A protein has these predicted regions:
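Hydrophobic faces of well-ordered beta-strands that scaffold small-molecule active sites
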Residues: 8-12, 52-54, 92-96, 123-127, ...
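Hydrophobic, small-residue-rich alpha-helical packing segments that form membrane-like cores
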Residues: 3, 9-19, 23-35, 77, ...
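A structural motif
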Residues: 49, 120, 233, 397-398
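An alpha-helical appendage that flanks or caps ligand/catalytic pockets
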Residues: 2-16, 148-211, 244-248, 255-393, ...
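N-terminal beta1-alpha1-beta2 module of alpha/beta enzyme domains
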Residues: 2-88, 211-214, 328, 436, ...
Length: 458
């Protein structure tokens, strides 16, 4: 007997501070004005997507001592945008990336509980940590933590926030107009938490929200990040969008759940994925090449090499050969605030590999960056992309995808109009929303209904 088809989850990532965005395209809109966010969210909701996802950047990146201005620079506050979007959408989940290294549990819990009320139960929290002192300077001098301590703090941060969410049970508000009694229990919201990172006590001032707690996402790919996701998260935002790497990641993380008393269906794996859509596969391949050349200008290619070489390469011609000099293997002093710096842990080996590739293919600096960088995950006609997405989900390489269009706010429209109907015809994607909350859309139980989720505050 064949197993039933898995239902696909789809989300929309409003792109910003990353090299997937072609902000200079004439069709691109603002990354700050609310109209762009609203249009993007309405398209996602029209297509019956599960949620909208906002990333976060806590400091403007620098390169060579100057603001890195080849990508989008600056963005509005995440909570402000999500609260505004709650007013112009009805079903779409609202996921915000909020840092656990530089915030406090009470403040963040208050913001998410408020967003959950305002949206009718559609809030989600992507819990992240920060690894660099450069970003920390915006918050406190010398402000960063070693990796182990970052995840220790993140775990306690989330546990503390959950205590605050659970300090209200949901039945405390009586609001009896005849007797003038508003609260059934004067101890509502009382909490006491004493731990390694937080020592707080008081009363939480936001009543229990529709979801009880926001849906929790985690985006780390390290060993610590995978364990954190397996023990705490409802969904994990990953970068593994191919069959082989996706299945390996999916199996690894799902197999960690048992040690925490959790089932496989209690954690969703949702890789980020870019796409290029055209009428035919051949046209899509050509369009993908155009998009990559838009994303990698000559100046961008030189800056990309500087991440690895850790040197000022501004005098080099992007249409010329790679530098003969070796990378500076000391502390990176060229690029600051860029996670990509950590992707090349052995710059000498990376430079050697790139020189060999460039020599074998007669590539210039720009051609090398175009060919070795991130190409679109899904390239093809609507039918090809729908088939590919479905095959990956049914093969347990993912539970769905967080789609990242290269143009905002209109870059999602064609996917919504052409790919989504094909997935619906295959019976693997909803035609209507399942219920009022994001937990309903994702098939996740309410915290009150999950065994072992006892409340620890009273």
């Amino acid at each position: 007997m064949s197993k039933p088809l898995k239902q696909i989850h789809l989300a929309a990532h409003f792109p910003g501070v990353n090299n997937t965005t072609v902000w200079s395209d004439p069709r691109a809109g603002s990354h700050v004005e609310f109209s762009s966010f609203a249009q993007f969210a309405r398209t996602a909701e029209r297509a019956k997507f599960d949620f909208l996802f906002l990333a976060e950047g806590l400091r403007l990146r620098e390169q060579g001592g100057k603001i890195y201005d080849l990508d989008v620079v600056g963005r509005p506050d995440t909570f402000t945008v999500l609260a505004a979007l709650a007013a112009v959408t009805e079903h779409l989940g609202l996921t915000g990336t909020i840092n656990s290294t530089f915030n406090e549990p009470y403040e963040v819990a208050r913001q998410f509980a408020s967003l959950d009320h305002l949206s009718g139960g559609r809030s989600a929290w992507n819990v992240v940590t920060s690894w660099d002192a450069f970003t920390g300077e915006n918050f406190r001098r010398g402000g960063f933590l070693p990796q182990e301590e970052r995840y220790s703090r993140a775990k306690e941060f989330l546990a503390t926030a959950n205590e605050l969410f659970d300090s209200w049970h949901g039945d405390e508000i009586l609001a009896d107009q005849e007797t003038g009694t508003f609260l059934r229990d004067a101890k509502a919201g009382a909490f006491v938490h004493t731990g390694q990172h937080f020592d707080i006590h008081g009363q939480f001032n936001v009543p229990r929200s529709p979801q009880g707690r926001p849906v929790v996402f985690q985006a780390g790919d390290s060993e610590e990040g995978r364990e954190f996701a397996a023990s705490e998260a409802d969904a994990i935002f990953s970068r593994h969008a191919t069959l082989e790497t996706g299945q390996a990641f999916y199996t690894d993380v799902k197999n960690r759940l048992a040690k925490y008393g959790r089932r496989h269906d209690q954690l969703l794996i949702l890789p980020a994925a870019t796409f290029t859509l055209a009428d035919t596969d051949a046209e899509a391949e050509e369009l993908a090449k155009v998009v990559r050349r838009q994303q990698v200008s000559g100046a961008t290619a030189i800056k990309h090499l500087e991440f690895v070489w850790n040197r000022d390469l501004s005098s080099y011609d992007p249409d010329g050969p790679l530098p003969d000099i070796d990378p500076d293997v000391g502390d990176n002093h060229i690029s600051k605030g860029r996670a990509q710096v950590r992707m090349y842990r052995d710059p000498l080996a990376t430079a050697r590999e790139w020189r060999e590739l460039a020599a074998a293919n007669n590539w210039s600096i720009r051609e090398l960056v175009i060919e070795t960088g991130n190409r679109q995950n899904f390239i093809g006609s609507a039918d090809t992309i729908a088939r590919t997405i479905n095959e990956l989900v049914q093969a347990d390489a993912s539970d769905g995808f967080i789609l990242v269009p290269h143009i905002t706010p209109g870059g999602l429209d064609e996917f919504a109009d052409k790919v989504v109907p094909l997935l619906q015809e295959r019976g693997v994607f909803r035609t209507e929303y399942e219920g009022p909350t994001l937990r309903h859309q994702l098939g996740l139980a309410h915290p009150d209904d999950v065994p072992g989720e006892q409340r620890v505050a009273s």
